Amino acid sequence: AIANQVAVTNDVSATAGVTYAGMNNAHAKFGDRSSDIVANVMTGAVYHKLIGQNLTNTSQLFQAGNVRVIDILGKAVVVTDAPALYVAGTPNKEYVLGLAAGAAIVHDAGELISNIDTVNGKERIETTMQVDYSFGLGLKGYTWDEVNGGKSPSNAAIGTGSNWDKVASDIKHTAGVVLIGDAAK
């Protein structure tokens, strides 16, 4: 959903990879609300690319008395190799999300159906259990588009940005920003 909004997307993949400056420019898309961004989400490869950029600048890396580890641009960092953060193509693209507080909320919808089935007459008694449940997902500033995404969507449908409609009156009241960089740079 975030990458479908040009106003909060910093796509430098045509000329550059992920850098601190690129992340800062993505955060700047929130303007005076950039302090609402509380966490950056990235792959392990991107995280280590950024740490490598810091290591080449050793004179500034330890200039402060308190060294904060895993803190990029004053934001917490979530490192996960989630497939959605890397898109193969020409060029291969790496995504870094800058998320606002409450960007995504997952909640139990309270619908739990379970069935236990026991089968006799075989060499051993067989008992199986199957449980189905439902949950809800909310993205800050967006609503689910049932016409495009369906009433009971698959994981692929949930991950398709065009299935989420922006309802926030101001882009700064949405889930966050995204930086897209060339994975080879």
Residue ranges and their predicted role:
Residues V8-N25:
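Surface-exposed ligand/attachment interfaces on beta-rich extracellular proteins
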Residues I2, Y20-G52:
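Structured, hydrophobic secondary-structure cores that serve as assembly/anchoring elements
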